[in-house]
A protein has these predicted regions:
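Transmembrane alpha-helices and adjacent helix-loop boundaries
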Residues: 1-290
Length: 290
């Protein structure tokens, strides 16, 4: 049994830990969606966290805990700076603005070759991420977000998502709560970037582009944003699909786009929708009734 597990872990450890880091990414965009914002900058925030921590551990010998903290603070600060002008937008305009920001980040990474390695990326990043780092991060983020959902802030997020104008008339600081959701989501995406960078040894600008942004959104929309379980389920499915369908690996971006369209059309509340699941179970029971 021990030998089997050792063999399994040596082959699939990166995949298993990627389930955790992708869950963090899905939860990061869940925060902004739960406040009614379609912001697509999470891949860029992941990249900022990954590059910040990698440069600090490789070039300056920072310890892993302090590099994690820096990798979370840096994207949160950037989110605060860009959030002031962009969060005045909504819907597709906000999505376009944040996508443009992601492209700016990618181009900055390409230009700063002496620091980031440019198109070649950073290689030889210390492998400091352990399985318990990922597990602890996912559990802690889930715990904090669960507390947030039940708090006054969480109720304010929900009110803003339902009707921003009405929320403002009720005395809710709409801009302040949007900024909070945006910055917290950026910090969580940065955490995922730190853990992923110190797991895979290598990061490059292509990992944090448009395709990755769509993938993160697909994870969350697929699982559903009515609960914290949904984004995690979506992250697991999107992470495992390429392994199950290796022969279609070249069409991964197409598959993500197709899944996103189908979910929006036929399951707008995602797979983890208790009402839909109850109906599905009810139909199953009727089908087996003699």
């Amino acid at each position: 049994m021990v030998d089997w597990f050792d063999n399994f872990w040596s082959v699939y450890s990166n995949l298993v830990l990627s389930l955790g880091t992708n869950s963090l990414l899905a939860l990061s965009i869940y925060l902004t969606l739960s406040c009614g914002m379609l912001a697509m900058a999470n891949a860029a925030f992941m990249g900022i966290g990954a590059y910040t921590s990698s440069i600090l551990t490789m070039n300056y010998g920072w310890s892993f805990p302090t590099a994690i903290a820096a990798g979370m603070v840096a994207p949160a600060v950037v989110a605060f700076i860009i959030g002031r002008p962009t969060l005045r937008l909504s819907g597709v305009y906000l999505a376009m603005a944040t996508l443009a920001f992601g492209e700016v980040v990618r181009l900055c990474i390409l230009r700063a070759e002496s620091l980031t390695g440019g198109a070649l990326g950073l290689n030889g990043i210390p492998q400091l991420t352990q399985w318990w780092h990922v597990l602890a991060a996912v559990v802690l983020v889930l715990f904090l977000l669960a507390r947030l959902r039940r708090s006054k802030i969480g109720r304010a997020f929900e009110a803003i998502k339902e009707d921003e104008t009405a929320a403002g008339l009720m005395g809710i600081d709409v801009n302040g709560h949007k900024m909070l959701a945006f910055a917290l989501g950026a910090a969580i995406a940065g955490l995922a970037g730190v853990l992923n960078a110190h797991l895979t040894f290598f990061i490059g600008p292509q990992e944090f582009g448009f395709d990755r942004g769509v993938e993160i959104l697909t994870m969350t929309i697929l699982g559903g944003i009515n609960s914290l379980v949904g984004p995690v389920i979506g992250a697991f499915i999107i992470t495992l699909l390429p392994e199950l369908l290796r022969s279609f690996a070249d069409y991964r971006a197409v598959a993500n786009g197709l899944i996103l369209v189908l979910i929006v059309l036929f399951l707008p509340k995602g797979l983890w929708n208790p009402a839909w699941l109850r109906r599905l179970v009810g139909l199953g029971k009727k089908g087996v009734t003699p």
